[in-house]
Design a protein with these regions (language model features):
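Cyclic nucleotide-binding regulatory module and flanking cytosolic helices
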Residues: 1-27, 76-79
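Short, small/polar residue-rich loop motifs at catalytic or cofactor-binding pockets
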Residues: 17-18, 36-38
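A short beta-strand-loop-beta hairpin characteristic of the jelly-roll/cupin
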Residues: 49-61
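Cyclic-nucleotide recognition modules
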Residues: 62-122
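Phosphate-/nucleic-acid-contacting segments
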Residues: 144-147, 151-207
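Short helix-to-loop capping/linker segments positioned immediately adjacent to catalytic or ligand/cofactor-binding
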Residues: 85-86, 106-112, 131-140, 158-161
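Glycine- and acidic-residue-biased ligand/ion/polar-headgroup-sensing regions
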Residues: 28, 39-52, 67-69
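Short phosphate-coordinating micro-motif centered on Lys-Gly-acidic
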Residues: 30-36
Length: 207
């Protein structure tokens, strides 16, 4: 979390220094859209957000699903003049705190709490890079089945169980893996018939 190791009594002062703004988004709303210029980073307080890449014809690919405690837009907030190459959506609604993190980077006399925040920010960015590297492994698989097996295997490892719940519905999972939804649904049925998995909605069991 961005505020790990920071005392509750210090968080309010840090938020004030970073000009924190709280926003609540309804279901199926956009937080930011492709091409916008942003000056703040978003910190997810409740529910989750999706980072989306959209092509000229409006086809979407979910790059990431970020839940509570995750940060987004920090790179654009630091660069300032670079337009967004992604969109950020709240399909299930979301509560977000926006932070002017460039104030943190520009400060020459940071408090201990702000130094801790900067440390946590770097850790979150490193975790994001690790996640994107893992996603590249899914996307480089040649077939839909290979992509599904790679993704479900990684989820089982992360959840430390062969019974797992994924954060996507069918369309979202297809968008995340960059495959056709109908083809993916058919492949899931074949994988179940082949005795590899059992599933119901977004609950899976690896056999």
């Amino acid at each position: 979390s961005l505020f790990r190791g920071i005392a509750k009594t210090e968080i309010a002062a840090v938020l004030q220094n970073l000009d924190a703004q709280l926003r609540v988004y309804p279901r199926n709303s956009f937080i930011w859209q492709l091409g916008e210029q942003v000056t703040t980073a978003g910190f997810v307080v409740a529910v989750s957000v999706h980072i989306l890449r959209e092509d000229y014809w409006g086809r979407q690919n979910i790059l990431a699903q970020l839940g509570c405690g995750h940060l987004f837009g920090e790179v654009y907030a630091c660069l300032r003049q670079v337009p967004l190459t992604v969109s950020v959506a709240a399909p299930n609604g979301a509560t977000v705190i926006f932070l002017d993190i460039k104030r943190l980077l520009a400060g020459s006399a940071r408090s201990e709490a702000e130094n801790r925040l900067l440390h946590n920010l770097l850790l979150l960015m490193a975790e994001r890079n690790l996640f994107l590297t893992q996603k590249m492994e899914y996307l480089t698989k040649r077939t839909t089945r290979e992509k599904l097996l790679a993704y479900l295997s990684e989820q089982a490892r992360l959840q430390q169980s062969n019974k797992l719940t994924i954060p996507f519905n069918r369309q979202q999972l297809a968008d995340f893996l960059a495959v056709d939804r109908s083809a993916m649904s058919g492949e899931l049925s074949k994988m179940q018939a082949d005795g590899l998995i059992r599933y119901r909605k977004n609950n899976f069991e690896l056999l």
